[in-house]
UniProtKB/Swiss-Prot annotation:
Pathway: Cofactor biosynthesis; adenosylcobalamin biosynthesis; cob(II)yrinate a,c-diamide from sirohydrochlorin (anaerobic route): step 6/10. Its EC number is 2.1.1.195. It comes from the Bacteria. Gene3D superfamilies: CbiD-like. Belongs to the CbiD family. The keyword Secreted does not apply. It is an enzyme of class 2 (transferase). This is Cobalt-precorrin-5B C(1)-methyltransferase. Keywords: Cobalamin biosynthesis, Methyltransferase, S-adenosyl-L-methionine, Transferase. It catalyses: Co-precorrin-5B + S-adenosyl-L-methionine = Co-precorrin-6A + S-adenosyl-L-homocysteine. The gene is cbiD. One of its GO terms (biological process) is methylation. It comes from Synechococcus sp. (strain JA-2-3B'a(2-13)) (Cyanobacteria bacterium Yellowstone B-Prime). GO terms for molecular function: cobalt-precorrin-5B C1-methyltransferase activity.
Length: 368
């Protein structure tokens, strides 16, 4: 894929961009507008930033076809560029249909197909930036007296959603079209670490007691606890290096807040938490169960399960979930304290809060 003006750094784009590209390609096919070609591939131009008409990017279209006279289907494939992202290469389908429109009807209807999540009220998990992107790219092309119905389908969405904490924030049965920009915000690259370090330095100039939140979900939990946003730092996958950086730059305390399925890695001494680096979560969970008095057979059952969430559900049925979560929080605190002492050569007061998929706090340690 290409930008209208190419930079030297490879670029990747967020899931909403590909959903909109698929819908736009399908609409163009219905209207008889030929797609462009670049390097022998079909591409569709997408206006990626609502504030800038010039910010157009070209997204490859894998397949496009008319299904009936008024319906079409197009497929693109998610490409986050050099950044680590679980949606890499996942197909993004858009089924579109032109319908007669009454004057009082909206011209554009967005629906969640298979694999695109729904919010608890049943509406599609399509958030503000994505909705605006659909509007600016589709509304100008809808014929007068017609409305366009768009159904986004993510065939791998339900499976991929099991590896996220979306359900903790009301996104059910699939992925969400999230984000506030077209380009992927790096979470595991060296560039993202440098950005986080700079933000950490700025916050430490004003506050010596900070909250490290793992991702936007952790940030939402922190804000619900009444924590001032100015004290919150989103740390993505670089928890260990940023803890050390905070200690070296004079932080007095750090409160770690995160989804248990992510922070659990710290209990096993894994301080760069990207799944592309290491993933021993079920093993860590099984070890915590044994430490709390669980049986070898119960630990074996944990190891047989596919996800942390399934394992926690299993433990909950046995009455073990709460004590095991508390044990994990204790281990995280102990390991993180030792990590900072080892690599920064000084102590740092730490606290840990774990929350579950429903966004409810399930364990805390180190809280005064």
């Amino acid at each position: 894929m290409q930008d209208a003006v190419q930079g030297s750094r490879p670029r990747g784009y967020t899931l909403p961009v590909f959903a909109v590209a698929s819908a736009r390609a399908a609409l163009h096919h219905l209207l008889g507008i030929p797609l462009e070609k670049e390097g022998g591939r079909l591409v569709v131009a997408v206006q990626a930033e609502p504030q800038s008409l010039e910010a157009r990017i070209h997204i490859p279209v894998e397949q496009v076809a008319a299904l009936e006279k008024t319906t079409a289907l197009a497929i693109t494939r998610s490409d986050p560029g050099p950044h680590l992202d679980l949606t890499r290469d996942t197909p993004v389908w858009a089924w579109v249909r032109l319908e007669e429109r009454d004057p009082e009807d909206p011209p554009l209807i967005l629906e969640a197909g298979e694999g695109l999540g729904r919010r608890t009220d049943g509406s599609p998990a399509i958030y503000a930036y994505a909705r605006r992107l659909f509007e600016i790219n589709l509304l100008p092309g809808i014929p007068p007296d017609c409305r366009l119905r768009v159904r986004i389908i993510l065939p791998e969405g339900k499976l991929l959603a099991e590896r996220t904490s979306n359900a903790a924030f009301g996104v059910l049965e699939g992925l969400a079209l999230l984000g506030t920009r077209a380009e992927v915000e790096p979470s595991s690259s060296v560039e993202s670490l440098e950005q986080a370090r700079q933000e950490l330095q700025q916050k430490l100039e004003r506050h010596k007691h900070l909250i490290f939140c793992v991702g936007s979900h952790g940030q939402q939990v922190a804000l619900r606890q009444g924590i001032p946003e100015d004290q919150i730092l989103r740390v993505a996958n670089w928890i260990g290096p940023l803890l050390v950086e905070a200690a070296l730059r004079g932080a007095e305390s750090i409160h770690l807040i995160g989804y248990h399925g992510k922070l659990i890695k710290l209990a096993g001494g894994i301080f760069t938490t990207s799944s592309h680096v290491a993933d021993a979560r079920l093993e860590i969970l099984a070890a915590a169960l044994i430490r709390r008095g669980g049986t070898a057979e119960q630990a074996r059952q944990v190891l047989e399960l596919r996800t942390v969430e399934a394992a926690v559900h299993y433990l909950d049925g046995l009455g073990w979930a709460a004590p095991v979560m508390q044990e994990l929080a204790r281990q995280i605190l102990e390991r993180a304290t030792g990590y900072v002492q080892k690599y920064a050569g000084r102590s740092l007061l730490l606290a840990v809060t774990l929350f579950d998929r429903q966004g409810q706090i399930c364990a805390q340690v180190g809280i005064p």
